[in-house]
């Protein structure tokens, strides 16, 4: 973050938009922090500096962060990620603590890329290289210059950033990527290398140059030249078309040889710096980001490669705090919200945010869905509702006057909506609302919780409440589990019920994790109508090893269990084996589920259940009950004892 005055990208961290973003510079307005800053601050959102049509080139959110030395309301970076892949320009990435800024931009490939540059500067990326990387990603042609600026500011790889700038000018995206590489190299020479690459036109080549000292040479026209420095190799590869530079000097020979390498963005994987080159070539901004990170960055870059923009941000993070920003949204960087950085909102960006948003969307999507992962040090709200305004913590509350009072803000965009505090020509939906992740899935997480101004008291939180207590219907997930069980149970044809219908046997299922047990329980409910399941509960602690103090008899552990009541012991044995075989092959928490058979000598008198009246109004919510609890023909037996 050296002071670099307003910075170079299209946006000058003050919130102004310079009109990079389109006709109605939708938000700008000077120092007023709301806008520019979270942008500059790191949470850049891709939107140009503040508002900006989503697609606008916008200076990425990474512009120098108010270079007057004061970090405006230090908004914990929580960049929602460079939207890269989907969504507008995706510049924002910068978020990461330090360097993040740069990386993010790159990923976004933000229109101008310039943004990336700015971000880099600001970030100064802990890694330093990060800054450059960002620019590279976004660099795409125009942005290049910006990239340079950022790098300089970052001071990150020394001249590395500058190198990036050069790359941008020359070949656009690739060039930028190269720059990132330079950052990684950090060596002054590295920076130069990047510049050279740009000249060549093989932006990727530039990246190679970045490689450590060798960079100088490598960056130069020849991807191979990059060989000089390990990172250089990568860059060189890029130039060749083979981000492969993977092998340091090898770059030229190995990845370089294959144009494919670069495209893949795999190059990034190969060797940090290489990654950068590769990313650029591919267009996988992420790759670039990685390069900046140097070694660390690479990992991030990889994710980016997948998702694209987000990844870049991550790369920066690699270097330092940036990670969070990088994660940006999703699992990988891709921008989904996935679990990780890329996805989008997901579990935590590259290292940065580990949040728990529910990522709910399964799969990559885990990306955004997970909810805006709460960032470092941001505890999740304690109570489901209460927090009327946003489930954030005090520091992130917008200044009182400035909060538009209408539209709910989509969680996760926290207050970065509408810098002017009102509809300023933007759609009424905060920029991130759309990619919010699967709407169909209410689970957990602030998302359905309190909306900005409360949502009319319609509901408190998503989840299964709503269905009758203790009753869940089926859903694809549970159906799949049930299917697996049915197949395994098909092996044992034994009586599952008895005439007297006494619940004398049971299967005690425990361990694994709460979620894995819960899912298994729902699956069993679907697969075996003849059983009755208790809700999940917790086991007490057993003995403390050694002579010391023992736990109190009531002390609950976090290990859960549930009991399956059955009418025949023989079926209990069969079910136990089926469950064992079902969970064993599965990955971690699930395979640790333990099962044992129990027998209740006098039987357990489960309370009788009377089917709801069909015609009466009373049936209103109850008639669904037999979906999973009843109607299987053995009802009569329950009350018979």
UniProtKB/Swiss-Prot annotation:
The active site is at residue 518. It comes from the Viruses. One of its GO terms (biological process) is regulation of DNA replication. GO terms for molecular function: DNA binding; DNA-binding transcription factor activity; endonuclease activity. One of its GO terms (cellular component) is host cell nucleus. Residues 387-395 are annotated as: Interaction with host CSNK2B. SUPFAM superfamilies: Viral DNA-binding domain. Residues 620-641 have a biased composition (Acidic residues). Its EC number is 3.1.21.-. It is found in: Host nucleus. Phosphorylation at Ser-385 increases the nuclear import efficiency of EBNA1. Residues 41-50 have a biased composition (Basic residues). Residues 40-67 are annotated as: Chromosome-tethering GR1. The record marks 518 as: Required for episome maintenance. Belongs to the herpesviridae EBNA1 family. This is Epstein-Barr nuclear antigen 1.
């Amino acid at each position: 973050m050296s002071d670099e005055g307003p910075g170079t990208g299209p946006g000058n961290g003050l919130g102004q938009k310079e009109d990079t973003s389109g006709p109605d510079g939708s938000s700008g307005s000077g120092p007023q922090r709301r806008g520019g800053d979270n942008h500059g601050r790191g949470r850049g959102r891709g939107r140009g500096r503040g508002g900006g049509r989503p697609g606008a080139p916008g200076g990425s959110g990474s512009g120098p962060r108010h270079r007057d030395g004061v970090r405006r309301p230090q908004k914990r970076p929580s960049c929602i990620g460079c939207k890269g892949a989907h969504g507008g320009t995706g510049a924002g990435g910068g978020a990461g603590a330090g360097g993040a800024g740069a990386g993010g931009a790159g990923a976004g490939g933000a229109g101008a890329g310039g943004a990336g540059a700015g971000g880099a500067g600001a970030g100064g990326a802990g890694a330093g290289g990060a800054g450059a990387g960002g620019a590279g990603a976004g660099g795409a042609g125009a942005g290049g210059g910006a990239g340079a600026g950022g790098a300089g500011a970052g001071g990150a790889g020394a001249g590395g950033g500058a190198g990036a700038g050069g790359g941008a000018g020359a070949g656009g995206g690739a060039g930028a990527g190269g720059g990132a590489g330079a950052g990684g190299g950090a060596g002054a020479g590295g920076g130069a290398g990047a510049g050279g690459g740009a000249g060549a036109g093989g932006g990727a080549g530039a990246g190679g140059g970045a490689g450590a000292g060798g960079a100088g040479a490598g960056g130069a026209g020849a991807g191979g030249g990059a060989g000089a420095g390990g990172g250089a190799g990568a860059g060189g590869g890029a130039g060749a078309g083979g981000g492969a530079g993977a092998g340091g000097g090898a770059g030229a020979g190995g990845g370089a040889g294959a144009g494919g390498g670069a495209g893949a963005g795999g190059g990034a994987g190969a060797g940090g710096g290489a990654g950068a080159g590769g990313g650029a070539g591919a267009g996988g901004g992420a790759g670039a980001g990685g390069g900046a990170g140097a070694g660390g960055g690479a990992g991030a870059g990889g994710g980016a490669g997948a998702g694209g923009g987000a990844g870049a941000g991550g790369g920066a993070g690699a270097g330092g705090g940036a990670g969070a920003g990088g994660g940006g949204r999703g699992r990988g960087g891709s921008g989904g919200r996935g679990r990780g950085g890329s996805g989008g909102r997901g579990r935590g960006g590259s290292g940065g945010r580990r949040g728990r948003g529910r990522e709910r969307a399964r799969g990559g999507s885990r990306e955004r869905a997970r909810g805006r992962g709460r960032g470092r040090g941001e505890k999740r709200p304690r109570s489901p509702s209460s927090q009327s305004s946003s489930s954030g913590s005090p520091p992130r509350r917008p200044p009182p006057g400035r909060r538009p009072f209408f539209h709910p803000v989509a969680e996760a965009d926290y207050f970065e909506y509408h810098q002017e505090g009102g509809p300023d020509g933007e759609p009424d939906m905060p920029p991130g609302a759309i990619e919010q992740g699967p709407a169909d899935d209410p689970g957990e997480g602030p998302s359905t919780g309190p909306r900005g101004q409360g949502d009319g008291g319609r509901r408190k939180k998503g989840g299964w409440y709503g269905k009758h207590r203790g009753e869940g219907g089926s859903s694809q997930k549970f159906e799949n589990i049930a299917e697996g069980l049915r197949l395994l149970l098909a092996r044992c044809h034994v009586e599952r019920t008895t005439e007297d219908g006494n619940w004398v046997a049971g299967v005690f299922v425990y361990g694994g994790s709460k979620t894995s047990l819960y899912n298994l329980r729902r699956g069993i409910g679907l697969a075996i109508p003849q059983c009755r399941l208790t809700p999940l509960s917790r086991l007490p602690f057993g003995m403390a090893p050694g002579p010391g103090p023992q736990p109190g008899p009531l002390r609950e552990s976090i290990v859960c269990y549930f009991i399956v009541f059955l009418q025949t012991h023989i079926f209990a044995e069969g079910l136990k084996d089926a469950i064992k075989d079902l969970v064993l092959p599965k990955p971690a928490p699930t395979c640790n589920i333990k099962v044992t058979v129990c027998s209740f000598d006098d039987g357990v008198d489960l309370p009788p259940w009377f089917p709801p009246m069909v015609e009466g109004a009373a049936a209103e919510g109850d008639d669904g009950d037999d979906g999973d609890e009843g109607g299987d023909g053995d009802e009569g037996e329950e009350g018979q004892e």
